[in-house]
């Protein structure tokens, strides 16, 4: 078949979809705002639930887009998408104009900016880091405190920027719990004598093998899970972090000293997605992600005929779900182009 499709976003969803669209014979322009494709996954070390190296998935995706039908544009952001006479006109911030018969938005998510939760001390106290910061340390093989010493007591705060009315994000980001479990296990593998604590609201392990990973973290690695909300983080004269928490299972307040505190940052609609929604009349939901036409039978379709969605631009998703969502988007696009506009 013939046709031109623009895919906006060069992460997991965009790369998977672009490769499949090209395989169908369509001409694909893949646009990524960063200078390098790969999205968030390229910044991660091991991924759950099997803890494989993320580069295995990246290589799979890169091989997918190594196709003559794909034109890759990096370091460019979309200004808007306009529909004229049945086709779409996409403009970029650099002034590039692209015409397409269909558009796939795969702009993904941004991590919650943890400095917005001032009570946790990110950007204020040494050794308060985010899950993304820790993943970068894993990749570099340099998990250490700011003074170069090994951490002996490490805490993880779940739901930072999720399930939080104060910051306006009442939804669950879905992946924070399992990411904390995975990272806690990796910490213990590097520092066997370390004491690791996870402070959680509820453990939401709703994916394949997630519950098994959670059980293993307790039985094999000795991770300590404390149910309750952290109210405040401070620092001692000796530069130890102090966490105050209400242990809701034990029914008593806790005060704990730590060497390192990891904030499990949740997901938000990406800034690039927000810009597109504002300039292209695309609807967003109460969670401020793109709102699909129908959550059950039209999760890839937008309110504009010919514009489709794939991946975490519509809601938090894991890698498996993102790839499946991208594949279903390709099916909808092919059907749309084949059966006329």
Residue ranges and their predicted role:
Residues 1-341:
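Residues forming the flavin
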């Amino acid at each position: 078949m013939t046709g031109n499709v623009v895919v906006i976003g060069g992460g997991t969803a965009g790369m998977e979809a672009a490769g499949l669209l090209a395989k169908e014979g369509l001409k694909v322009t893949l646009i990524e705002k960063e200078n390098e494709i790969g999205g968030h996954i390229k910044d991660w070390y091991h991924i759950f639930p099997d803890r494989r190296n993320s580069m295995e998935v990246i290589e799979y995706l890169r091989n997918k887009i190594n196709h003559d039908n794909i034109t890759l544009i990096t370091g460019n952001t979309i200004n808007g998408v306009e529909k004229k006479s049945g086709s779409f006109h996409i403009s970029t911030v650099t002034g590039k104009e692209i015409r397409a018969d269909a558009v796939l938005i795969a702009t993904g998510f941004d991590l919650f900016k943890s400095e917005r939760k001032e009570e946790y001390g990110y950007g204020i106290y040494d050794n308060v880091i985010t899950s993304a910061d820790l993943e970068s340390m894993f990749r570099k093989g340099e998990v250490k405190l700011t003074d170069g010493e090994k951490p002996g007591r490490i805490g993880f705060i779940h739901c930072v920027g999720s399930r939080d009315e104060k910051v306006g994000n009442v939804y669950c980001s879905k992946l924070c719990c399992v990411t904390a479990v995975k990272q806690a296990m990796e910490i213990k593998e590097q520092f066997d004598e370390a004491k690791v604590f996870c402070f959680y609201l509820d453990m939401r392990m709703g994916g394949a093998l997630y519950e098994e990973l959670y059980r293993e973290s307790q039985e094999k690695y000795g991770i300590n899970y404390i149910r309750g909300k952290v109210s405040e983080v401070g620092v001692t004269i000796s530069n130890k972090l102090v966490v105050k928490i209400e242990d809701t299972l034990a029914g008593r307040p806790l005060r704990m000293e730590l060497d390192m505190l990891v904030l499990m940052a949740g997901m938000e609609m990406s800034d690039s997605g927000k810009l597109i929604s504002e300039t292209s009349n695309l609807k967003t939901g109460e969670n401020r992600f793109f709102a699909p036409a129908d959550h059950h039978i039209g999760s890839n379709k937008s309110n504009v005929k010919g514009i489709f969605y794939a991946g975490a631009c519509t809601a938090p998703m894991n890698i498996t779900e993102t790839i499946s969502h991208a594949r279903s988007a390709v099916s909808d696009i092919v059907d749309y182009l084949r059966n006329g506009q």
